[in-house]
């Protein structure tokens, strides 16, 4: 059996500035190579097989040897499914991935694995055939530097670490064909139980693990706890493997040939006794049976592991598994610190609130790195601030777990109270422009605060001065304030006496604030605005105050504009507007027609002469109206004929009151009914004299008088 007893000069030069690591008394076999033109590492695991352990007998050394037994050589071209697991497997999972870190530097591939089992690593390479020794202890006696890294603790039961090896080595030397894999395993101290596994084969092929399992009957469960964190590893030397540093032992003329396909080396570990094994991060002796591989596991020293925990460093392309116990511990510390900061922050906020500050309070509670923020108005924030302060004080005294539940309950109750009040208060018309902007988040209203008037304060917010003592002393304060706000809202939304419900008049409240923007008006529904004097508050003044500002329709003259503008107006109001528009148009048309008629009368129909008017026959109206025929009333004055009235008849045989027709003929020489010219006898006489009496001429007064 060959052993490395000296350190190479090159390694001595590189490690001169670092602590000397005790060299193991044996070696391990690595087979490195390239596959598919890419540098790829293949790792197979199996628990060590039965062999009597060899005590080193050294004082101060607590590590024990790995026991190896017959390792069957298997060649697998494909992956085997996980359903081959024997039914005798305990209820715990077959394996759990523990913390594994594989930093790469140059041609060295170092790996630290926290696990409860001992492993055998096989590294395939292009170097044709390597022999290995059996029934001897092989140790790779070399020193290497470990790239700094931090591993988080994990609790693994029946745990076997699976190595995810990157196919590319970013810092590697392309001229080298050999990469070396070193596994460092740690088993927890004394009082831990270890479970024996049977013929379990784990194969990591192309980053996929498969288990070939034939388990022995279940034994006492093994609870493997690894250390929380490694020490700062910059100065801690670990194993550096190279092709020249590995020495193999030829025994029994057995050889293992590298196959072009995936190779799998299985190891079995069997512990029939209840002995407890401790494997520290120190050089270990490994025993190898005939034709089998013995793997050296180089780990850190126990004393060095008890050092201060370094800050975790995130490595690329390395999977890290953090145990739930460590996560709970860290989150507990974070929550406790966050609650302490929250207590201090809310105390300061409470002092600012009591000093009369009008700024909004921003409530931010840190839970597991997340921020739950809520913007509060001063009257409501006072309640939640006091509650949060009391609960946070209780939290700091009682603990992080109970305090968190109370803080959560108080926080969400405060959210419900605040948003319930906020929803009821945002529709209130009593909230002026300045108050609206003050209720906005602080980061949005900060630029507008300088523009607000000096007399703007929180006193205008309903319920502040009256409810402030109740809110601080009594837990039922928000409910009372909620009732008062709802009553005030009902009074604000109720219609004033005499106000028309379907036509709302919006007045601009110029005295409330000097700000130019009016956020509250953005939520108002579009409607027709009347003049400042037309409030329409009295029903009796509706007919007098309906002077609508028609200039508002100028921008909505066509199509969709009118539809959008009047879509929110009551139909009765639209009907009235349409009727008024029609009446106005009809009046304009009638006046124009009358003006045209007046001009025509003056030009075409000159007044009748006084002689012709005096020459009209007069008829005395009798009781039976036989003298005037069927006429019952005068067409000019529209009054009925009564007894002893004097009527006259025009040549067109239309009867009128003589005074009425005389006035008409003085203005126009036509019949008011048929527009026939008067006097026709004069016109006919001038045109053609006729000896025959005119049948249309009215009868003489004598004949009328003699008729009765």
Swiss-Prot record:
GO molecular function terms attached to this record: protein kinase A catalytic subunit binding; protein kinase A regulatory subunit binding; ubiquitin protein ligase activity; ubiquitin-protein transferase activity; zinc ion binding
Annotated region described as Disordered, given as residue ranges: 1-31, 53-90, 244-317, 425-495, 685-708
Example of a GO biological process term: long-term memory
Keywords, comma-separated and alphabetical: Acetylation, Cell membrane, Cytoplasm, Cytoskeleton, Endoplasmic reticulum, Golgi apparatus, Membrane, Metal-binding, Phosphoprotein, Synapse, Transferase, Ubl conjugation pathway, Zinc, Zinc-finger
Region called Interaction with PRKAR1A, PRKAR2A and PRKAR2B, residue ranges: 531-708
SUPFAM superfamilies, A to Z: RING/U-box
Catalysed reactions, as listed in the record: S-ubiquitinyl-[E2 ubiquitin-conjugating enzyme]-L-cysteine + [acceptor protein]-L-lysine = [E2 ubiquitin-conjugating enzyme]-L-cysteine + N(6)-ubiquitinyl-[acceptor protein]-L-lysine
Modification sites for Phosphothreonine: 246, 389
Region Mediates interaction with TBC1D31, annotated ranges: 550-570
Gene3D superfamilies referenced in this protein's UniProt entry, alphabetically: Zinc/RING finger domain, C3HC4 (zinc finger) (3.30.40.10)
ZnF region ranges: RING-type: 634-675
Pfam assignment, any one: zf-RING_2
Biased amino acid composition, Polar residues: 74-90, 249-276, 484-493
Major location (coarse): cytoplasm
Biased composition regions of type Low complexity, renumbered to the chain: 699-708
Modified residues (Phosphoserine): 196, 253, 309, 323, 342, 432
Residues that bear N-acetylserine: 2
Membrane-traversing stretches: none
Entry protein name: E3 ubiquitin-protein ligase Praja-2
Organism of origin: Homo sapiens (Human)
């Amino acid at each position: 059996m060959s052993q490395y007893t000296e350190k190479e000069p090159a390694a001595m030069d590189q490690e001169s500035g670092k602590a000397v690591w005790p060299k193991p008394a044996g070696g391990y076999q690595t087979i490195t190579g390239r596959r598919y033109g890419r540098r790829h590492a293949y790792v197979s695991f199996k628990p060590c097989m039965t062999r009597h352990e060899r005590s080193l007998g050294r004082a101060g050394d607590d590590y024990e040897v790995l026991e190896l037994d017959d390792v069957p050589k298997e060649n697998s071209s494909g992956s085997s499914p996980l359903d081959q697991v024997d039914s005798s497997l305990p209820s715990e999972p077959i394996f759990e991935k523990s913390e594994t870190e594989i930093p790469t530097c140059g041609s060295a591939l170092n790996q630290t694995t926290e696990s409860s089992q001992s492993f055998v690593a096989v590294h395939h390479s292009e170097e044709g055939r390597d022999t290995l020794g059996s029934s001897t202890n092989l140790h790779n006696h070399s020193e290497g530097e470990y790239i700094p890294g931090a591993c988080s603790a994990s609790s693994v039961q029946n745990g076997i670490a699976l190595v995810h090896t990157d196919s590319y080595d970013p810092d590697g030397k392309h001229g080298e064909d050999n990469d070396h894999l070193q596994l460092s395993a740690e088993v927890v101290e004394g009082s831990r139980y270890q479970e024996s596994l049977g013929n379990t084969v784990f194969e990591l092929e192309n980053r996929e693990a498969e288990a070939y399992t034939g388990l022995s009957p279940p034994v006492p469960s093994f609870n493997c706890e690894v250390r929380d964190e490694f020490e700062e590893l910059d100065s801690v030397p670990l194993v550096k493997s190279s092709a020249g540093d590995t020495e193999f032992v030829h025994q029994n003329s057995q050889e293992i040939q590298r196959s072009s396909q995936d190779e799998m080396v299985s190891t079995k570990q069997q512990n029939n006794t209840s002995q407890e094994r401790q494997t520290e991060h120190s050089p270990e002796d490994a025993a190898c049976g005939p034709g089998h591989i013995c793997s050296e596991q180089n780990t850190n020293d126990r004393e060095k592991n008890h050092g201060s925990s370094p800050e975790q460093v995130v490595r690329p392309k390395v999977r890290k598994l953090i145990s739930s116990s460590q996560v709970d511990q860290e989150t507990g510390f974070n929550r406790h610190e966050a609650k302490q900061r929250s207590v201090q922050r809310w105390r300061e906020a409470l002092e600012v609130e009591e000093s009369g500050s009008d700024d909004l309070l921003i409530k931010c509670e840190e839970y597991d790195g997340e921020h739950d923020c809520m913007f509060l108005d001063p009257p409501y924030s006072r309640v939640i601030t006091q509650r949060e302060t009391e609960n946070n004080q209780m939290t700091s005294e009682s603990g992080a777990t109970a305090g968190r539940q109370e803080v959560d309950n108080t926080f969400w109750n405060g959210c419900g109270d605040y948003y319930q009040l906020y929803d009821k208060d945002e529709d209130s018309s009593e909230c002026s422009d300045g108050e609206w902007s003050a209720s906005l988040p602080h980061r949005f209203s900060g630029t507008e605060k300088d523009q607000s008037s000096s007399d703007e304060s929180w006193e205008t917010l309903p319920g502040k001065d009256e409810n402030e003592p109740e809110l601080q002393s009594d837990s039922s304060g928000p409910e009372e304030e909620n009732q008062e706000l709802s009553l005030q809202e009902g009074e604000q939304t109720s219609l004033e006496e005499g106000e028309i419900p379907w036509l709302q008049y919006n007045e601009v409240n110029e005295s409330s604030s000097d700000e130019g923007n009016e956020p509250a008006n953005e939520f108002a529904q579009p409607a027709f605005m009347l003049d400042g004097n037309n409030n329409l508050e009295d029903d009796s003044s509706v007919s007098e105050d309906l002077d609508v500002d028609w200039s508002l329709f100028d921008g909505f003259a066509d199509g969709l504009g009118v539809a959008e503008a009047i879509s929110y107006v009551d139909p009765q109001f639209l009907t009235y507007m349409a009727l008024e528009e029609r009446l106005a148009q009809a009046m304009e048309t009638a006046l124009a027609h009358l003006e045209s008629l007046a001009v025509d009368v003056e030009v075409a129909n000159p007044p009748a002469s006084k002689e012709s008017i005096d020459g009209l026959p007069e008829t005395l109206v009798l009781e039976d109206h036989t003298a005037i025929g069927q006429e019952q009333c005068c067409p000019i004055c529209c009054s009925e004929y009564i007894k002893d009235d004097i009527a006259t008849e025009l040549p067109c045989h239309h009867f009128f009151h003589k005074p009425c027709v005389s006035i008409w003929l003085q203005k126009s020489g036509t019949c008011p009914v048929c527009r026939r010219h008067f006097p026709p006898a004069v016109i006919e006489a001038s045109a053609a004299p006729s000896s025959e009496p005119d049948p249309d001429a009215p009868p003489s007064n004598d004949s009328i008088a003699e008729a009765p």
